[in-house]
Amino acid sequence: DAVLGNEESAKYVTGIAFHGYENDGFDDFSGGLEYVTENYGKDVYITEITEYSASIDFASNISYSLQNVVINPLNYGLKAGTYWNFVLTSDGQPVLGNTAECYGVINLDLESDGWHYSKNASYYAMAHVSKFVYDIDGKDAVRLGTESSNTNIIATSFYRADGAVVVIVHNISDVSYEAVDVVIGDRQFTYEIQPQSVVTIVC
């Protein structure tokens, strides 16, 4: 409030970034994201949130990304989210000046027959949005209000300039399949989502 609530200083601010450290996530930032967007109309960003070596497997990692960088923050007006690093080795190297054991979006490893790359869970979490949500003829996609009555299901959706509606749905449960009823205006259909899985629907 000290900066954004002052008319003179606020005109020099285009956005506010919420920076993540160990164990930080969407729950730590949701109040701030909502407060800034609703009271000041400034862009909001999440920086350096990423899965790390304490995670169990690919499913838990993609779930972490979808909950903390992609779906939940987008519903709170997120302008952009960034990960810890774009390219690292599969064991999180190089580490400069700290002891973080974080993953890059891409792994790049030198093996006996040369360099090899692989994609981490965060790559696919981003791809569920970036592959389907884009501008058309200079017209940006518009985020739609999206609600879920199931606590295991989180979702966000966009209206594209070509008239398509893009819905990204994630089942956060690590044990149960969830049948999701998707309702868009007068259209409705049901889709069953596996545990800790994500689906992007274009209709």
Short names for language-model regions:
Residues E192-C203:
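C-terminal beta-strand-rich structural cap/linker in extracellular carbohydrate-active enzymes
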Residues N23-F26, Y52-I56, L88-P94, D174-Y177, ...:
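Flexible loop/turn segments at secondary-structure boundaries
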Residues F132, G145-G185, Q196:
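Carbohydrate-binding surface patches
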Residues I46-H128, R143-T146:
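Aromatic/acidic polysaccharide-binding cleft in carbohydrate-active enzymes
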Residues S30-G32, F58-S60, D140-A141, A179-G185, ...:
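Composition- and surface-driven signal marking solvent-exposed, interaction-prone regions
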Residues E8, G41, Y45, L74-N75, ...:
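Hydrophobic alpha-helix feature that most strongly marks membrane-spanning transmembrane helices
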Residues V13, G41, L78, Y103, ...:
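Active-site lining segments that contact anionic ligands and/or coordinate catalytic metals
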